[in-house]
Each structure stands twice: as structure tokens, then as C-alpha cells.
């Protein structure tokens, strides 16, 4: 029992995707799940498309905890109730640090969810959503157009080359 807990701890920390897939998460190809992301108590109700990045501290919530109060009412009418919702994330999606995705939400393809956003409603394809509650703030095309002059081509650099490049930018 203790050995299993130790293995689970290290697997969750260093091999998050494999850990959550064992628990039932459906995950497409080329996904990145960062340490500290949580798929809650029902990861089998969550589907991630291809090329999805889930950052540190992201929470997927598949149930409504408010039923706890109803179960506590004296009439016993609700003593065994729960309320669940699936969560579906499309292809090519980035979910920012500490975002919360609530039950029943569908996030479309080619979306960015901002850091700290609380997503309570569906997000359509090709959108950026942020805020509490999350709302669409612009399209992917608008984002690309707005930042195209600022994009830096650093993904093919080594970490040393990238550091040197970025530090030289600061000097200009």
C-alpha cells in the first residue's frame, strides 16, 4: 500500500500524462501535461484532443460539489445524489497556469485559455478566452496579427543560444 502511494506520487510528478491516462483520462497525440495539473476524481469523464498543453495548477472539475449541501438536508430526498458533467478539449489548445475548467464544458479547436481563467461555458473554435468567469476576448487570427511583429523565433535554439539571444535583446 505504501509502495503504491510512493509510485503514484512520483508517476504523477514526473509522468503526469501516463498517470492520468491510467486513471481514465482520454488523451490525444502530442499532449503536454505539466506537474500539478489535476483531472479530479473522475478523469475518465475528460477528453483531450491532439496537441493540447495543460499547464501547472490547472484543475478540471467534473462534478458539482454543491450537492453536498443538498445531501445534508433533513428530508433524505437527496441523500445519495451527485451531479456530473463531461469535459471535452479540442485539438491544438493551450490551457494556462491555474485555469479551472468546470463540468460540462467543451473547448473548441485552436484555443488559448488564459492563466487563472474559470471556464464555465463552452468556448468556440479559434478563440482566446480569459477572466473570471472566462469570456472570449479575441480570435486566434486577431492574436496572431496583433503580435506578429513581436514573435521571436527561438524554439529551435539550444537553451544556451536562447539565453544569449534574449539577454542581447535586453541590451538593445
PLM region spans:
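Hydrophobic, membrane-inserted alpha-helices
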Residues: 31-33, 113
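Residues that scaffold the ATP/ADP-binding catalytic core of kinase and kinase-like folds
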Residues: 63, 122, 146
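Conserved hydrophobic/aromatic beta-strand scaffold that supports enzyme active sites
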Residues: 118-120, 128, 136
Amino acid at each position: 500500500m505504501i509502495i503504491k502511494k510512493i509510485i503514484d506520487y512520483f508517476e504523477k510528478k514526473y509522468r503526469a500524462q501516463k498517470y492520468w491516462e491510467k486513471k481514465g483520462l482520454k488523451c490525444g497525440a502530442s499532449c503536454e501535461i505539466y506537474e500539478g495539473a489535476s483531472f479530479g476524481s473522475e478523469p475518465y469523464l475528460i477528453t483531450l484532443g491532439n496537441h493540447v498543453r495543460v499547464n501547472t495548477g490547472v484543475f478540471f472539475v467534473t462534478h458539482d460539489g454543491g450537492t453536498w449541501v443538498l445531501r445534508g438536508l433533513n428530508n433524505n430526498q437527496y441523500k445519495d445524489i451527485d451531479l456530473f458533467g463531461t469535459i471535452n478539449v479540442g485539438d491544438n489548445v493551450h490551457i494556462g497556469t491555474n485555469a479551472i475548467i468546470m463540468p460540462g464544458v467543451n473547448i473548441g479547436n485552436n484555443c488559448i485559455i488564459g492563466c487563472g481563467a474559470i471556464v464555465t461555458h463552452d468556448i468556440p473554435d479559434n478563440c482566446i478566452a480569459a477572466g473570471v468567469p472566462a469570456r472570449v476576448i479575441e480570435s486566434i487570427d486577431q492574436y496572431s496579427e496583433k503580435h506578429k511583429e513581436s514573435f521571436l523565433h527561438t524554439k529551435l535554439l539550444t537553451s544556451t543560444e536562447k539565453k544569449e539571444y534574449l539577454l542581447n535583446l535586453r541590451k538593445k
